[in-house]
């Protein structure tokens, strides 16, 4: 199993539970992937079902599976197909090591879109413009957001949706599915802890999430300011505020905020191409890996496309059934 995010952990435990020997390879120095850095978004003590706690739960339960071999800070240099199964050459802090396996589960996850790929955002030159990933870390560490320029708590915050998603020019025509959910939950968390904070959303449209969303939408419209447009120009305004030019009621106006959060989408990882070439895998229309399950290669979680934490866990657990079917048939 390659990758120890929620999908990799879920797949490993599901397979181990059925008596299969699992080897978990992770290039980072710890387990959990991106989701291990996410924060609880409960409002007034009520769970918002963001999935962040599911990661902690998986990591806690992973301790019950000491039989799973874990290689941290390890990369795979080469994968060779054999008559039955594969040989993978591992390169890690313990040196070089070849391992044999009957099937490969790629749970390599995703890469958050890099705003520097969109020059009009001026991301590197606007100090109080951050990504939603950075906001997650802020809320997990300090509970409340703060401006990177001076550490002050912002009184006004703008969220810009669909950054790096629904963007055919950048090769990302798809919706990342999770951005609206995480942005609205974090905005709600901030308002719960700092009720006077004014929050504005720049959006194309809103991706619904959760069964209760239609009922909640009315209150969300009242809680935040909604501007149905994505700004084209971004600049530093007075007091290190983030300025934007936007059309409001047929007139171009400049608005400014203490801080701006870019709701970045999910893109394929940098090492995806390496695994595609090693295993002769095809690519989906969205640019993510396609599995080759008839030949023992399975792709799970967000390695196969944008996916929430909860869906990644269930997808990986479900794929374990197919891995077992393949292994039984290959014997």
Regions found by a protein language model. Give the residues of each.
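Residues forming the flavin
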Residues: 1-331
